[in-house]
Amino acid sequence: NEGMDRSHNPEFTCMELYVSYKDYNWMMSFTEKLLEEICIAVNGTTEVKIGDNVVSFKAPYRRLPILEAIKEKSGYDLEGKTEEEIREIAKSIGIEDTELMGKGKLIDEIFGETAEGTFIQPTFITDYPVEMSPLTKMHRSKPGLTERFELMVNGKELANAYSELNDPIDQEERFMEQMRLADKGDDEAMVIDHDFLRALQYGMPPTSGIGIGIDRLAILMTGQPTIQEVLLFPTMKPEKKAPKSSVAEWAAVGVPEQWVPVLNKCGYYLVQDIKEVKAQKLQQDVCGVNKKYKLGYDNPKVEEFQQWIDNANK
């Protein structure tokens, strides 16, 4: 549940794909071929101009471990660092509220602050620390890392994928660690999903899975500047609320409290809104709402409406 900006919308379309007996290496190869073919189908070429950048979707894409990406872009080498050492680095580059973050969240924030926005050409950021990836299989040859990648294009994440964790014992331990992070104040930590654990206990084959943001994919393939341009019904800024007279102000001209929301429903928000209205028109509007919504109020006589109007004009 994220906010709204040029690349985020509270409601979005996502494609999830799972393939048994495959791993994240296969999924990277599949993804780069898929995007190359989509780009050719949409644009007749493998290149798209997005703002000032020309992005090439021609496979293969660069594959870069996340810790190497941070080192390349910022100069900070986080490999082998303790949580406290990483926290001090995060503080030094201006990241706030670090005391609430675990090791994985700290690395994620440092990557976002120093590296993410710099990857314009499609780049697979791979091999995330286990603290950042509670649903991902451990790396087959790199202790402490997982078989996960995120695809960065034009400075934003387009896809997230893993070799799926299918060991129920390991998964339960990961969930417990997430609960400990939640206790520390991490609002992005996961809760224990007992149904998921039970399903893993029944058995799940080795699997690779990926999620691709379709709205972001549409932005990239069509060269649009914002996500709002590719959504049928984009989230809009809330309308400004009309100013309203208080119940006391309405009472001052003789309007009983129960009729104030009815007047508002009719479009009369301020006492001054009824000054130029004929009593018969006001009666018709107010009594119409009373009837339509079955409020059960005794309708005022036209003389009472006239009295409200006269008082409003004093």
Q: Model segments located where?
A:
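Class II aminoacyl-tRNA synthetase catalytic cores and aaRS-like
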Residues: 1-242
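Compact, charge-rich alpha-helical regulatory domains located at protein termini
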Residues: 239-314
